[in-house]
Swiss-Prot record:
Subunit structure: Homodimer.
Organism: Gordonia bronchialis (strain ATCC 25592 / DSM 43247 / BCRC 13721 / JCM 3198 / KCTC 3076 / NBRC 16047 / NCTC 10667) (Rhodococcus bronchialis)
List of residues binding UDP-N-acetyl-alpha-D-glucosamine: 22-23, 30, 236, 241, 302, 324, 332
GN (gene name): mshA
A Pfam cross-reference name: Glycos_transf_1
EC assignment: 2.4.1.250
Record flagged with keyword Transcription regulation: no
Keywords: Glycosyltransferase, Magnesium, Metal-binding, Transferase
Organism ancestry: Bacteria, Bacillati, Actinomycetota, Actinomycetes, Mycobacteriales
Catalytic reaction(s) noted: 1D-myo-inositol 3-phosphate + UDP-N-acetyl-alpha-D-glucosamine = 1D-myo-inositol 2-acetamido-2-deoxy-alpha-D-glucopyranoside 3-phosphate + UDP + H(+)
Protein name (database record): D-inositol 3-phosphate glycosyltransferase
Biased composition (Basic residues): 439-449
Length: 458
């Protein structure tokens, strides 16, 4: 339980994607879910949350009361449509100006803490932290150096601009939140992060939405055959997530099972994103070329309640990603009692209990995935046992647990920041005793600026 100072109001920064967007297409994915779920649960603990995100439509209201104590501020920065995420660094000045102007319209000391999500937001948070005189907590969600070390075929490497930008944020943030111990180790080994400033805060799932249920009812609601063995991919369609690997690996099984009592079907749920936008029909073309187009079903991104039915309808959910800082899909599927076949990369080894709630595959070779799929589907009793274990495993990963750990990180950030800034220490003490929001604006300052060469870093 957190015993130190806690913020009254937090500015969450999510530049490139809104928590109100539908996950599974464009730039909306697990981070959207993370920001929304943690924001609403922080609000339930009495913390006011304001989320700054870039407006993507002229109809976006400047302020949206999204939930009790949760406000989304849509900041105009660049054109509403047609702006690729790779072009967003050029709009960070405009976005930062919008954030600073919003705060300037309030009384001094309006926000107690900034929590930035993804490196673009970290750049904004770094400047706002120095302007407002409050601590900055940063969650990377993904790291360029990690992604570039495990690129999928046909994927585009993250630019050096991002690597440098991430390095700056890692150096500047008061605390860094990593999804897993693996990500914490990557921050230390690849970015030279101070281990003492890292908190491991594991993401969760909405355990009230994602629950086990009758497979027959779920399949009926989705119009799926009751007799098929269904293997499902959920996520953005891009090389990093490797849905093509699943289709290629399943192809031999689909061909061999056509005349059996239990034919195999692949279900792809999501929309194109990132470099996947360059070839939006690539997966459809692949299924056609492999002669299995009739056994591959495509669905658009689904709302949570509908997505829960997708998980329940599946015999197995596949997460073949080349890189994954955690893997929310894996936890959501297991919460619904569905076992997971996942690549043994990043946080997936935490999200999936290999051999107990699913299977971890140690390579991205098509043959290895075909063998893993065949072995899993050939043992329905074993899959059923894994499904029962999966729900128990998933119950360790609630968003309430996530927010408990997040608030502890916030408290440490506020304490360490106050220790370095005597005026901040007095402000925190006054806040805890009186609940007063009266604080004088502190002058612009830089805590450190240590951009190091990207080679030869110790």
């Amino acid at each position: 339980m957190t015993t130190g100072p806690l913020p009254r109001r937090v500015a969450l920064i999510s530049v490139h994607t809104s928590p109100l967007a539908q996950p599974g297409t464009g730039d909306a994915g697990g981070m959207n879910v993370y920001v929304w779920q943690t924001a609403t649960r922080l609000a339930r603990r009495g913390v006011e949350v304001e989320i700054f995100t870039r407006a993507t439509s002229s109809s976006d209201a400047p302020r949206v009361a999204a939930a009790p104590r949760v406000t989304v501020r849509n900041v105009v920065a660049g054109p509403f449509e047609g702006l690729d995420k790779r072009d967003l660094p050029a709009q960070l000045c405009a976005f930062t100006a919008g954030v600073l102007r919003a705060e300037a319209a309030q009384e001094p000391g309006y926000y107690d803490l900034i929590h930035s999500h993804y490196w673009l937001s970290g750049q904004v948070g770094w400047l706002a932290r120095d302007r407002w005189g409050v601590p900055l907590v940063h969650t990377a969600h993904t790291l360029a150096a990690v992604k570039n070390a495990s690129l999928a075929a046909g994927d585009t490497a993250e630019p050096q601009l991002r690597v440098i930008g991430e390095q700056q944020v890692v150096d500047e943030a008061d605390r860094l939140i990593a999804n897993t111990e693996t990500e914490a180790s990557e921050l230390i080994s690849m970015y030279g992060a101070d281990p003492a400033r890292i908190d491991v805060v594991t993401p969760g799932a909405d355990l009230d939405c994602y629950t086990p249920g009758p497979r027959e009812m779920a399949r009926t609601s989705l119009g799926l055959d009751q007799n098929e063995a269904i293997v499902t991919f959920v996520g953005r369609i891009q090389p990093l997530k490797a849905p093509d690997l699943l289709i290629e690996a399943a192809a031999p099984l689909i061909r061999r099972s056509r005349t059996s009592r239990r034919p195999v079907r692949v279900l792809i749920v999501g929309g194109p994103s990132g470099s996947g936008l360059d070839r939006p029909t690539a997966l459809i073309d692949l299924a056609h070329d492999l002669g299995i187009a009739d056994a591959v079903t495509f669905l658009p991104p689904q709302a949570p309640a509908r997505l829960a039915d997708v998980y329940r309808a599946s015999n197995l959910v596949a997460v073949p990603s080349h890189s994954e800082s955690f893997g929310l899909v894996a936890i959501e599927a297991q919460a619904c009692g569905t076992p997971v076949l996942a690549a043994d990369v990043g946080g997936l080894s935490v999200a999936v209990a290999g051999g107990r709630t699913g299977v971890l595959v140690g390579s991205h070779a098509v043959g290895d995935w075909t063998n893993a799929l065949e072995k899993a589907l050939a043992q329905p009793d074993r899959l059923a046992e894994m499904g029962r274990n999966a729900r128990v495993h998933a119950e360790q990963f609630s968003w309430d647990h996530t927010v408990d750990a997040m608030l502890s990180s916030y408290s440490r950030a506020m304490q360490s920041f106050a220790a370095r800034n005597p005026d901040a220490a007095q402000s925190v003490a006054a806040q805890n005793v009186t609940g007063s929001s009266s604080r004088t604006r502190r002058p612009w300052r830089r805590r450190r600026s240590t951009l190091l060469p990207m080679t030869g870093r110790s």
